[in-house]
Amino acid sequence: MKKLNISADTPLSALFHDGCHDQLVNDIEYLCNFLIDCQSDVDVLKVSRFDFDFSSPKFRPCKVYQKLANMVNRHLLIVSHRELSRYMAEHSNLHASAESIYRSIYKYM
């Protein structure tokens, strides 16, 4: 697994192999459906912040964890599952604890 220098501006797509970005577009678009403010004209491969709309009746955290687990299961990551969890803890409002996100993703693997 690769070690990346992740900053606040690092897009989620940077954690994945370049060759799989065409698959990743659909995955990130799916996640964008649950965000508070995601413009339809945004390049989803550049999204670096995931503020989920917990007040939306269509939002369920388990859907996000299932999608992230699916990404891990397809071996698209260039970083570890734990690093993805740390990224989501820092770049989303899903949960402040990377360990909690890690366990939640693992549950759906």
Per-region residue spans from a language model:
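Flexible coil/loop and intrinsically disordered linker positions at secondary-structure junctions
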Residues: 2-109
